[in-house]
A protein has these predicted regions:
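Active-site beta-alpha loop architecture of Rossmann-like, nucleotide-cofactor-dependent enzymes
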Residues: 5, 124-127, 179
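Conserved Class I SAM-dependent methyltransferase catalytic core
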Residues: 149-179
């Protein structure tokens, strides 16, 4: 029942290969829409913007954008050490220099604001976790899937702290569940 991405240690996202060892969330194809939205915003923007990606995981979202728009500053934040180590390896594989990754809890983040803040947070409720496919529960890191509550704590934090996290005229892009 192990996903092929954990067997091979890699997956494709937005036309690039990314390392995805066990313990790091496997990016889903629908998350590429978040990249598309960021690309649309950045294609109409000036250079030298700061793009921040909370819950960065393997770094695939941030790195996919940085590859298309190299004239910006990119910061990826994740509380998982293995995710940050993997994101740094993925950065090296793609040959990108303008991307930094930090091991930090987003609830304690108080550094610089972003012109673009992105996040694909853990959004499943405890009830939804109970009903997930067994292979997902056994293989994906649960902390990347759920806040171990009702699935809204990350959204509440990001929205209530918008002015502390996002610069004036900046935007926030969030992946939200279908439900």
């Amino acid at each position: 029942n192990k996903p092929v991405q954990y067997i091979t240690g890699e997956t494709y996202f937005y036309n690039d290969k990314f390392l995805t060892p066990p313990g790091v969330f496997i990016p889903r194809p629908e998350t590429e829409l978040l990249v598309d939205c960021a690309v649309e915003f950045l294609s109409k923007s000036k250079d030298n913007l700061r793009i921040i990606d909370f819950c960065t995981g393997s770094g695939c979202i941030l790195l996919s954008i940085a590859k298309k728009f190299p004239n910006h500053e990119y910061i990826g934040i994740d509380k998982s050490e293995i995710a940050i180590k993997t994101a740094k390896k993925n950065r090296k594989l793609l040959g990108l220099k303008n991307v930094q990754f930090f091991n930090q809890d987003i609830f304690k983040y108080n550094q610089s604001k972003g012109d673009l803040l992105m996040c694909n947070p853990p959004y499943l409720s405890n009830h939804e976790i109970e009903n997930l496919e067994q292979s997902v529960k056994e293989n994906d890191p649960l902390s990347a899937l759920t806040d171990f509550k009702n699935g809204t704590s990350f959204y509440k934090h990001l929205i209530s702290n918008f002015n502390k996290l996002v610069k004036k005229n900046g935007i926030m892009l969030l992946e939200i569940p279908f439900s």
